[in-house]
Amino acid sequence: MGRNKGIEQKVWPLAERVGGELNLEVVDVEFVKEAGRYFLRIYIDKDEGVDLDDCQNFSERIGVILDEEDPIPQSYYLEVSSPGIERPLKKLADFEKFAGREAQIKTFAAIEGQKQFKGKLLGVRDGQVVIDAGKGEVQIPLEQIAKANLTFDF
């Protein structure tokens, strides 16, 4: 399963435009190839959570724009959904918004001898993400974060 960052970067501002019109936050945009087929996945959210109508309205509007702008040369399937309970964290604002929640962060390079941190998000300080991973606070620059998401233990 490979991702195509170039297409994602072209689609992101189009998705944010639609999100702004519908009062929805664009959480993530993924363009992937799975089992020989391409999928454009757009994850949306709002404070009270999204429902099927939100996803349908967003899908209809973004579909028209994607047809007009045509940023994707090959055929693909469009999927619009909620990010789920283990939503990805992409922007500094995400880490601030979900301070106090449990999260998992993977970094590109080792920080304090490790590349994976799981613990309580403490927010943002001096432009860096702060997490308490059980051994005290760790500050992680956003550009060093390879992947981050909320975690939920059942």
Swiss-Prot record:
One of its GO terms (biological process) is translation. CDD domains: YlxS_C (cd01734). Keywords: Cytoplasm, Ribosome biogenesis. The keyword Cytoplasm applies. Its main location: cytoplasm. Pfam families: DUF150_C, RimP_N. Coiled coil: none annotated. Signal peptide: none annotated. It is found in: Cytoplasm. One of its GO terms (cellular component) is cytosol. Required for maturation of 30S ribosomal subunits. Belongs to the RimP family. This is Ribosome maturation factor RimP. It comes from Carboxydothermus hydrogenoformans (strain ATCC BAA-161 / DSM 6008 / Z-2901).
